[in-house]
Amino acid sequence: MKVRPSVKPICEKCKVIKRKGKVMVICENPKHKQRQG
């Protein structure tokens, strides 16, 4: 899980979602998981 000020999809399989007001990226590749904050 990467925590960064701006989250962007890295590959085609990355999905940008909102959970509890936080923007997150979920993906098949665990290295692509990101959270804003």
From Swiss-Prot:
Keywords: Ribonucleoprotein, Ribosomal protein. InterPro entries: Ribosomal_bL36 (IPR000473), Ribosomal_bL36_sp (IPR035977). Pfam families: Ribosomal_L36 (PF00444). Coiled coil: none annotated. GO terms for molecular function: structural constituent of ribosome. One of its GO terms (biological process) is translation. The keyword Ribosomal protein applies. GO terms for cellular component: cytoplasm; ribonucleoprotein complex; ribosome. Belongs to the bacterial ribosomal protein bL36 family. NCBIfam families: rpmJ_bact. This is Large ribosomal subunit protein bL36. It comes from Staphylococcus aureus (strain NCTC 8325 / PS 47). The lineage of its organism: Bacteria, Bacillati, Bacillota, Bacilli, Bacillales. The gene is rpmJ.
